[in-house]
């Protein structure tokens, strides 16, 4: 196998070190380590927010990367990426650290390494969605969890895009199968400006097309509102 490539021939930037931790493609791990990644993933997301694990590892789409944060060959976290077409932007499908190791700063370590990994790969923007703390019917405990998650990303340079009505298709998300979410984005370049209203419409279109595979005329796209950029 050529250094810097996965078993499928997909080219990866070389692992980015931060102290003793390293990001590695999941397909380069041994069977036991892949099993640990699966546990981390399945413990970290409820059923309605996760895909089948094998679809993320053995049956990935072109432009997708499955990465594990590893310490001395032991996985500590998992991230799943998908390129948003030819935009130079990347969608963060999943980002989770081992529940048994939370509170040790691993989320920040993995985030920093992920941004460095994307920078080395020529990426310019990382886009993702999170559960909305303001969703009607969300109980106090869930509001706290969701708000804490948003603040984590904001501390690491991400912003909530000025978008209303953004929803994602999930089989268990209410009667109509669509879940209201917040759309966030973070610049990959060191010190780069955070995206704002001027870029939001293009980001929304790229996410619906390349992450959710919606046709340009899908009514959900028209129902998603983008605030006018500041003058």
PLM segments and residue spans:
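Conserved acetyl-CoA-binding loop-helix of GNAT-fold acetyltransferases
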Residues: 97, 103-120
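A eukaryotic "domain-to-IDR transition" signal
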Residues: 104, 128-131, 161-164
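Conserved GNAT acetyl-CoA-binding A-motif
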Residues: 118-141
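Long hydrophobic alpha-helical segments typical of transmembrane helices together
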Residues: 203-231
């Amino acid at each position: 196998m050529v250094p810097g490539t996965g078993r499928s021939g997909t080219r990866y930037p070389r692992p980015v070190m931060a102290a003793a931790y390293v990001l590695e493609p999941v397909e380069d791990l041994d069977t036991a380590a892949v099993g640990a990644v699966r546990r981390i993933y399945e413990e970290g997301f409820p059923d309605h927010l996760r895909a089948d694990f094998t679809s993320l590892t053995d049956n990935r789409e072109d432009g997708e990367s499955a990465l594990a944060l590893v310490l001395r060959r032991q996985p500590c976290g998992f991230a799943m990426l998908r390129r948003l077409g030819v935009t130079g932007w990347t969608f963060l499908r999943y980002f989770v650290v081992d529940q048994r190791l939370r509170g040790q700063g691993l989320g920040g370590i993995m985030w920093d390494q992920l941004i460095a990994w994307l920078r080395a790969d020529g990426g310019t923007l990382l886009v993702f969605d999170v559960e909305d703390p303001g969703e009607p019917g969300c109980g106090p405990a869930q509001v706290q969890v969701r708000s804490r998650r948003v603040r984590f990303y904001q501390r690491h340079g991400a912003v909530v895009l000025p978008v209303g009505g953004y929803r994602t298709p999930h089989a268990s998300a209410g009667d109509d199968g669509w879940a209201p979410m917040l759309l966030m984005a973070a610049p990959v370049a060191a010190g780069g400006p955070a995206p704002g209203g001027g870029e939001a419409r293009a980001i929304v279109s790229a996410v619906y097309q390349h992450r959710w595979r919606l046709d340009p005329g899908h009514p959900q796209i028209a129902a998603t509102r983008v605030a006018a950029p500041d003058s």
